[in-house]
Amino acid sequence: MKRSSTHAEELKLRLMTIELLQAAKQHYTYRELSSKTGLPVTVLSRYAKGHVLPNTERARTLWKILKKLVGLEAELGRKIRFNKNGYFDNTWIVGDFNILRQAASHALNTFAGRRVTIILTAAVDGIPLATMVADSLGVNLVIAKRNKEVGVPAFLEETYVLSNSGVTMTLYVPKNALKRRDSVLIVDDMIKTGETQAALINIIQRARAEVAGVYSLIAIGDDWRERITLPKGCPIEVVTKVRPK
């Protein structure tokens, strides 16, 4: 069994390296990639087109090089944008399949060994990432929505006030979606004030489930940390932090 697991991991690395190479091809020519990797253009082309897979040793070498060029942090750095009013524009992040795929793999590696039975996110921008993470971890996804759905008999709900606007917000989760024995990982594309994540934590605790951790691609500043209270030893993983404009 151990031998099969090793082969599976090696194959996964080789396939993920090809995916990174295909992502790199969006920003660099084959000639540029050849210069950076030391591999002939023809070899890189065959890899990128899926005609052949690199062996494990070459995949490891390529992975290290490509990760610096188009790895998760590098890609986020390219896509993070603020508009003229200083508001964060996540349009080019939540729909980027390369970023979502890498983020899901990163979440899998980060929370490996921890018990996670449910992924919880708030509608709407966190849904693509949460879906990918749930698929990667092999667990179900629960979405906290801003409106009650017809046909759902009972809800867990949490109301909070958005600090910057004074607007009241309520999140609703079907009552039977979270069970007492669940260990719930909160996933979102961005943490700004921490209020949404704090509300999700309260919903989990109201269901008497366990908080497994919080995972986010981006965090704006550090003020949000004051609003998020997690059980001792419960991790918060943020891929990239940016300063508020």
Identify the function of each model-found stretch.
Residues L129-L137:
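Short Gly/Thr/Asp-enriched flexible loops that form oxyanion-binding sites at enzyme active sites
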Residues S35:
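Alpha-helical residues within the helix-turn-helix
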Residues K179-D182, I186-R206, E210-A212:
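Active-site/ligand-binding-proximal alpha/beta "capping" segment
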Residues V139-V184:
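Short, glycine/charge-rich flexible loops or terminal/linker lids adjacent to PRPP-binding catalytic cores
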Residues S5-H27, R31-E32, A48-R115:
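Active-site-facing substrate-recognition patch
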Residues V116-A123:
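Short glycine-rich phosphate-binding loop at a beta-alpha junction
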Residues K2-L13, I201-K245:
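PRPP-dependent phosphoribosyltransferase catalytic core
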